[in-house]
Swiss-Prot record:
<feature type="compositionally biased region" description="Pro residues">
    <location>
        <begin position="1166"/>
        <end position="1181"/>
    </location>
</feature>
<feature type="region of interest" description="Disordered">
    <location>
        <begin position="94"/>
        <end position="1210"/>
    </location>
</feature>
<dbReference type="GO" id="GO:0048705">
    <property type="term" value="P:skeletal system morphogenesis"/>
</dbReference>
<feature type="modified residue" description="4-hydroxyproline">
    <location>
        <position position="680"/>
    </location>
</feature>
<dbReference type="InterPro" id="IPR050149">
    <property type="entry name" value="Collagen_superfamily"/>
</dbReference>
<feature type="modified residue" description="4-hydroxyproline">
    <location>
        <position position="245"/>
    </location>
</feature>
<feature type="modified residue" description="4-hydroxyproline">
    <location>
        <position position="281"/>
    </location>
</feature>
<feature type="modified residue" description="4-hydroxyproline">
    <location>
        <position position="464"/>
    </location>
</feature>
<dbReference type="GO" id="GO:0034505">
    <property type="term" value="P:tooth mineralization"/>
</dbReference>
<feature type="disulfide bond">
    <location>
        <begin position="1248"/>
        <end position="1280"/>
    </location>
</feature>
<feature type="modified residue" description="4-hydroxyproline">
    <location>
        <position position="839"/>
    </location>
</feature>
<feature type="compositionally biased region" description="Low complexity">
    <location>
        <begin position="1102"/>
        <end position="1148"/>
    </location>
</feature>
<dbReference type="GO" id="GO:0045893">
    <property type="term" value="P:positive regulation of DNA-templated transcription"/>
</dbReference>
<feature type="modified residue" description="4-hydroxyproline">
    <location>
        <position position="965"/>
    </location>
</feature>
<feature type="modified residue" description="Allysine">
    <location>
        <position position="1197"/>
    </location>
</feature>
<feature type="modified residue" description="4-hydroxyproline">
    <location>
        <position position="425"/>
    </location>
</feature>
<feature type="propeptide" description="C-terminal propeptide">
    <location>
        <begin position="1208"/>
        <end position="1453"/>
    </location>
</feature>
């Protein structure tokens, strides 16, 4: 029955379930029972005595177990409850008789203990005393219920239910009050804790032995006797028959009431008494340690308005103005451009036939032949390697309890228990032989002190003192030595094909290699069939252009050309007369928001918000500590009978030993049967406290009392833990043959088989893909004059001519496109109210409202089901020594024992002379644990620790990008003959070549190794001998290796103290222009273009990575060196680009950082003292939360009066509720911070993208991020663009002053000079917020790059007489800046598009003597290239050449 579960316990367990449940996705399962839908894990009572639970979609029901044997005349039953109970005022007739009410005792602490008088007769039991103060904390609780109970709890957590309301923190306890007046005698309380021992009285004389009293109750079991001498081993008994394992029984009925427990140890201090009179104020105490972090204070008043932001960038260009008046007629234009080319002339006569062309390239392979018939199944392959473990399946529903398993193997022997206490004296033995000479008599006069004994064993570790003040941080460790190289990284993707290089000159002829061994004669091959004629080859390439034809006749005049471009703007005309006054301006934009008004009254509490989305599952925690010992298991089956021992011989009794030291108090035995009630004696007056006397002699053992009446059956017990595994059963019969296994993975390739017979030729293959264009052949002979070409495309527009005479008026133009949207008109008068619209759609779920008032305590939950039996837990730690067992039966007469221990000391002898100093005493046994010491003062600062161990090798970095392909070099001259090379390794197997003509019969080959039998192939057609095929392409990259094992999760560091809020930073510069749109998808590969004219020599490329050795190509015929073509004419300059648009407005300034947390509220007044609480519950289950502060749940009262009472004063419950609710509030705050970080210094987000997803309505601004997670002390401040989710990291020095930075020693020799590396006052660009550690920023940027797919950055180059990108004088980009990325790749203005940047504004194209600027933008998906760390201009070095830089933020998304 779960009636003992208190709602607060469920609340707290629910919170822990929330932590796990919130990070898992539990599918929504429910049960339908008699038309009622019940969520998974909920319990309900369809009938009063029937309880059901929804378990994974199935309703499981059971009867409620009741205690039917109620010992009262009129049991009562509450409405809706199944089980009856006795009213509280009813007293069972079986309870003890109540004696005469004693005099009312004075309240106050228990007095000192009186002396022990002679044992008197048992008095009648007195009136029940006042309720005692709270009992001591209970024993450690059972181990946590583990997975099954946690899952049952998590099912009870309803995702749709309201959140847990959380009150404020508990105030400090008030001072202890004075004792209250004595109350009326209450009901019988629990056994109070023993009072503090009184001052020891003087020892009284030993009284005379009193007469034997009436038989008393059975005493506690005696302390364990000394271990008996081991008997001789008996003969082995017969092996018992193995019993069948029984099935696990259902949980038993409620057991009988247990016996009263032992007196507990001294209890904790009771609850605070009523408030005493205020004392005189004490001196100020030493400052205490910093308290725990207070709850957030109330929201502060709005701060004063911030200072005005920096001026924004120029606004966008305004709309075009109205057209001006018609200008005067221009001068006549220049003559028109040459007319278009004339129409093609008639086709000429067919020319004479040219010489035969060069042999065409091999045709594409034919289509694949039809599939042949399936071959016979081959032999089974070797069994494949074991597959990887599959993903864990969905957990099945708990099964019914299985049959009790056989006992597991015997666990390891526990450590030897402590020495048992002395046993009761045995029965007197037979008189022994005369003993050896007795020990020396009583000690003489004390000798001089002996030497100091050995140091005693170290006592048990005391309770840890309070934490000392934190020591100062140690010195920063030096950098670790370089780690070992990491493992090879995964092969990078195949790089793009480089441009085909020009063929190099033929190398010198190598010296002849060594002669090969003659092969064994091969079998003569059969003559191949004549191959079918090949399909016609592809059309040959277009030949080189013929010589220029004769000049044609002048064509007719062309149509008039397109209107030329507008001429250069003339000088400004004279100032016009003043215009008419303009119209009234439009309504202005709304003014800035006014000052924030005073805070309004607190609104009413909103409705509870919907729970947030589930967070991601946390990483698996470390192995927890071993749990405390589990519940007592069910009794195991009776073991086989032991071997009977041989009867021992009667030993000679030894001398009576000296009394041993008093052993530790044994656990209290079960109470004996109740004795016969003695006659009531008169109540004597209360005596004065006497001094404690010596212990009296032990009385005779009383006769056993009559058995008491049977108690009521106890509550139904929780199911015990699963018993230990039994011994393994006998080997089962051989199982049936299993089903045929799945096909094994293909075996390794077998050894090469013998050459098969030549098959018939296959059918013609499908035409293959068009091969890549081969190198240009030598120029052919001059062909006949070709036919006139088609009309060429229109050439580029010529330069602008002078304006021609004005033309005649044109036709009326077509209707223009709609104009731009006009300015907003003045607001019209309000229209009449429209009819009421239909109700709108249901809005989205609102944000969570403020916390509602605390709900009333819910009714006790319904009874839960017993959980399924847990798995067998790991063996618990060795248990404490058990209580002493009952005395065994008297053994048979043993043999003569060893010499007895020393008898009691004889009468003291005469004092002897002082003895010599004794030897050093034996090491003393460890003393008992001392009380916890007061906290020590903080120790001095420790010396800095040694340098850390060299770090483990880092992971291998990503494979570098392939270098740019270098330009084709000019063919070198033929070199001298080289020395003979060694025979090269065979190249990779190429694809089969085209069918060739039949070959001649080869020599007989040597027999190959025997291959594994292949499937019978269908007889193939005989194929022609093919030509040598071209080398095959390199194979696809191998599959990536299996991911390495996940490293262990690091421990969470302690959260640092909140630092003081820093001063507001200066207003940052205006933001850079917004990012360009995302890069479009990559286009399809274009067809190979025709070969262009030979270009001019390019810049020298970077050295590429060494490629893998290519397969040897077939040797080509050495062609004659082609004639070098003449340099082409210089092309006309391109038309000037249209001017770029003005930049967008800058981003709004960042939001200020959140204000500091408010101070903790003042402590509330101390509450009124509550009555003493019930005894503490058993300790918490291991590994869970500490529930020891919860009030105990009420019990269903039975005739024993119940074990617990609910406190009458609700304040006790409220105080403890406050602790629970505070804990819950802290928990929920932490969960919320994990699931939805706020981007502050204490709670940084991972990236701005995370912040945007969690808080889509937040504005762009500066926030804190911690991409590598872990401790937040290395978080960095970045700018978050909330519209794009970009994380922008600013440089620590965003601008380089505009001045002359470099004077070249040789001004004529222009080369790129790196600003940070080579210029005298230059510096590399570093990134991060002000005051951040560059090493921390570098690590954070590494993680940020890994979590981003695109990066971009802008750099503005301010120039004076320095070209930044396009050189207006030459029209090329040879003087463009170089940028160096973070991975040291250089980014250029021209070349491979993957390593080039673009410009948004280019105002540095010529030397004008004035300052201009060029804005460079680089955007890439290779995030490791950004941010840019250095810039190298080329056009600098003269005294009048100056430049400066503005470095924009690197933005990642």
């Amino acid at each position: 029955m779960f009636s003992f579960v208190d709602l607060r316990l469920l609340l707290l367990l629910g919170a822990t379930a929330l932590l796990t449940h919130g990070q898992e996705d539990i599918p929504e399962v429910s049960c339908i029972h008699n038309g009622l839908r019940v969520p998974n894990g909920e319990t309900w009572k369809p009938e009063v005595c029937l309880i059901c639970i929804c378990h994974n979609g199935t309703a499981v029901c059971d009867d409620v177990q009741c205690n039917e044997e109620l010992d009262c005349p009129n049991p009562q039953r509450r409405e809706g409850e199944c089980c009856a109970f006795c009213p509280e005022e009813y007293v069972s007739p079986n309870s003890e008789d109540v004696g005469v009410e004693g005099p009312k005792g004075d309240p106050g602490p228990q007095g000192p203990r009186g002396p022990v008088g002679p044992p008197g007769r048992d008095g009648i039991p007195g009136q029940p005393g006042l309720p005692g103060p709270p009992g001591p904390p209970g024993p450690p609780g059972p181990p946590g219920l583990g997975g099954n109970f946690a899952s049952q709890m998590s099912y009870g957590y309803d995702e749709k239910s309201a959140g847990v309301s959380v009150p404020g923190p508990m105030g400090p306890s008030g001072p202890r009050g004075l004792p209250g007046p004595p109350g009326a005698p209450g009901p019988q309380g629990f056994q109070g804790p023993p009072g503090e021992p009184g001052e020891p009285g003087g020892s009284g004389p030993m009284g005379p032995r009193g007469p034997p009293g009436p038989p008393g109750k059975n005493g506690d079991d005696g302390e364990a006797g000394k271990p008996g001498r081991p008997g001789e081993r008996g003969p082995p008994g017969p092996q018992g028959a193995r019993g069948l394992p029984g099935t696990a029984g259902l949980p038993g009925m409620k057991g009988h009431r247990g016996f009263s427990g032992l007196d507990g140890a001294k209890g904790d201090a009771g609850p605070a008494g009523p408030k005493g009179e205020p004392g005189s104020p004490g001196e100020n105490g030493a400052p205490g340690q910093m308290g725990p972090r207070g709850l957030p204070g109330e929201r502060g008043r709005p701060g004063p308005p911030g200072t005005a932001g920096a001026r924004g960038n120029d606004g966008a260009v305004g709309a075009a103005g109205p057209p001006g008046p018609t200008g005067p007629t221009g001068p006549p234009g220049f003559p028109g451009a040459v007319g278009a080319k004339g129409e093609a002339g008639p086709q000429g006569a067919r020319g004479s036939e040219g010489p035969q062309g060069v042999r065409g390239e091999p045709g594409p392979p034919g289509p694949a032949g039809a599939a042949g018939p399936a071959g016979n199944p081959g032999a089974d392959g070797q069994p494949g390697a074991k597959g990887a473990n599959g993903a864990p399946g969905i957990a099945g529903a708990p099964g019914f309890p299985g049959a009790r398993g056989p006992s597991g193997p015997q666990g390891p022997s526990g450590p030897p228990g402590p020495k048992g206490n002395s046993g009761e004296p045995g029965a007197p033995g037979n008189k022994g032989d005369t003993g050896a000479k007795g020990e020396p008599g009583a000690t003489g006069v004390q000798g001089p002190p002996g030497p100091a004994g050995e140091e005693g064993k170290r006592g048990a570790r005391g309770e840890p003192g309070p934490s000392g003040l934190p020591g100062p941080p140690g010195e920063r460790g030096g950098p670790g030595s370089r780690g070992f190289p990491g493992a090879d990284g995964v092969a990078g993707p195949k790089g793009p094909s480089g441009e085909r290089g020009a063929p190099g000159p033929a190398g010198p002829k190598g010296s002849p290699g060594e002669a090969g061994r003659p092969g064994e004669a091969g079998l003569p091959g059969a003559k191949g069939l004549t191959g079918s004629p090949g399909s016609p080859g592809p059309d040959g390439k277009t030949g080189p252009p013929g010589p220029a034809g004769q000049d044609g006749r002048p064509g007719p005049a062309g149509p008039p050309g397109a209107r030329g471009q507008a001429g250069v703007m003339g000088f400004p005309g004279p100032k016009g007369t003043a215009g008419e006054p303009g119209k009234a301006g439009e309504r202005g934009l709304p003014g800035p928001p006014g000052a924030v008004g005073p805070a309004g009254k607190d609104g009413e509490a909103g409705a509870q918000g919907a729970p947030g989305p589930a967070g991601p599952a946390g990483e698996r925690g470390e192995q927890g500590p071993a749990g405390s010992p589990g519940f007592q298991g069910l009794p195991g089956p009776a073991g086989p009978p032991g071997e009977a021992g041989k009867p021992g011989e009667q030993g000679v009794p030894g001398d009576l030993g000296a009394p041993g030291p008093s052993g530790a108090r044994g656990e209290r035995g079960f109470p004996g049967e109740r004795g016969v009630q003695g006659p009531p004696g008169p109540a004597g007056p209360r005596g004065n406290n006497g001094a404690p006397g010596n212990d009296g002699a032990k009385g005779d053992t009383g006769a056993p009392g009559a058995p008491g009446s049977q108690g009521a059956p106890g509550l139904q017990g929780m199911p015990g833990e699963r018993g230990a595994a039994g011994l393994p059963g006998p080997k089962g019969d051989r199982g049936d043959a299993g089903p045929k296994g799945a096909d094994g993975s293909p075996g390794k390739d077998g050894a090469r088989g013998l050459t098969g017979p030549i098959g018939p030729p296959g059918p013609a293959g499908a035409p293959g893909d068009k091969g890549e264009a081969g190198p240009s052949g030598p120029p052919g002979p001059t062909g006949a004059r070709g036919a006139p070409g088609d009309r060429g495309e229109a050439g580029p527009p010529g330069p602008a001519g002078f304006a021609g005479p004005p033309g005649a008026d044109g036709q009326p133009g077509a209707k223009g496109e709609p104009g731009d949207t006009g300015v907003k008109g003045d607001a019209g008068p309000p229209g009449p109210a429209g009819p009421a619209g239909p109700p709108g759609p249901i809005g989205n779920v609102g944000a969570p409202g403020p916390k509602g008032p605390r709900g009333a305590a819910g009714p006790p939950g319904a009874t839960g089901f017993p959980g399924a039996a847990g798995r067998v837990g790991p063996p618990g730690p060795s248990g404490n020594a058990g209580p002493p067992g009952p005395p065994g039966p008297v053994g048979k007469e043993g043999g003569k024992g060893p010499r007895g221990e020393t008898g009691p000391a004889g009468r003291p002898g005469e004092v002897g002379p002082p003895g010599p100093p004794g030897p050093a005493g034996e090491k003393g046994s460890p003393g008992a644990d001392g009380p916890a010491g007061s906290p020590g003062t903080p120790g001095p600062q420790g010396i800095a620790g040694q340098r850390g161990v060299v770090g483990l090798p880092g992971q291998r970095g990503e494979r570098g990008f392939p270098g740019l392909p270098g330009p084709s070099g000019e063919p070198g001259k033929q070199g001298p003959s080289g020395s003979s090379g060694e025979r090269g390794p065979p190249g990779p197997m190429g694809p089969p070549g085209l069918a060739g003509p039949p070959g001649e019969s080869g020599r007989e080959g040597s027999p190959g190794a025997e291959g594994s039998p292949g499937r019978d192939g269908a007889p193939g057609a005989k194929g022609d001998r093919g030509e040598t095929g071209p080398a095959g392409p390199p194979g696809a990259p191998g599959a990536p290796g299996a991911p390495g094992p996940v490293g262990p999760a690091g421990k969470n560091g302690d959260r640092g103290e909140t630092g003081p809020a820093g001063p507001a930073g200066p207003i940052g510069p205006a933001g850079a222009r917004g990012p360009a749109g995302p890069q479009g998808p990559r286009g399809d590969k274009g067809e190979t273009g025709e070969q262009g004219d030979r270009g001019i020599k390019g810049h020298r490329g970077f050295s590429g990575l060494q490629g893998p050795p290519g397969s040897p190509g077939s040797p080509g015929e050495q062609g004659p060196s082609g004639a070098s073509g003449p340099a082409g004419p210089r092309g006309p300059p391109g038309s000037a680009g249209s001017p770029g648009k003005d930049g967008l407005n800058g981003l709004p300034g960042p939001i200020g950082p959140p204000g500091p947390r408010g101070r903790t509220g003042d402590s509330g007044p101390a509450g009124p003292p509550g009555p003493p609480g019930p005894p503490g519950p058993p300790g918490p289950p291991s590994g869970g939360y500490d529930f020891s502060f919860l009030p105990q749940p009420p019990q269903e009262k039975s005739q024993d009066g119940g074990r617990y009472y609910r406190a009458d004063d609700a304040n006790v419950v409220r105080d403890r509720d406050l602790e629970v609710d505070t804990t819950l509030k802290s928990l929920s705050q932490q969960i919320e911070n994990i699931r939805s970080p706020e981007g502050s210094r204490k709670n940084p987000a991972r990236t701005c993208r995370d912040l945007k997803m969690c808080h889509s309505d937040w504005k762009s601004g500066e926030y804190w991020i911690d991409p590598n997670q872990g401790c937040n002390l290395d978080a960095i401040k970045v700018y978050c663009n909330m519209e794009t989710g970009q994380t922008c990291v600013f440089p620590t020095q965003p601008s380089v002053p505009q001045k002359n930075w470099y004077i070249s020693p040789n001004p004529k020799e222009k080369k790129h000079v790196w600003f940070g590396e080579s210029m005298t006052d230059g510096f590399p660009f570093e990134y991060g917020s002000e005051g951040s550690d560059p090493a921390d920023v570098a690590i954070q940027l590494t993680f940020l790059r890994l979590m981003s797919t695109e990066a971009s950055q802008n750099i503005t180059y301010h120039c004076k007489n320095s070209v930044a990108y396009m050189d207006q004088q030459t029209g090329n980009l040879k003087k463009a800046l170089l940028l160096q990325g973070s991975n040291e790749i250089e980014l250029r203005g021209e070349g491979n598009s993957r390593f080039t940047y673009s410009t948004l504004v280019d105002g540095c194209t010529s030397h004008t003597g004035t300052w201009g600027k060029t804005v460079i933008e680089y955007k890439t998906t290779k995030t490791s290239r950004l941010p840019i760390i250095d810039v190298a201009p080329l056009d600098i070095g003269a005294p009048d050449q100056e430049f400066g830089l503005d470095i924009g933020p690197a933005c990642f998304v």
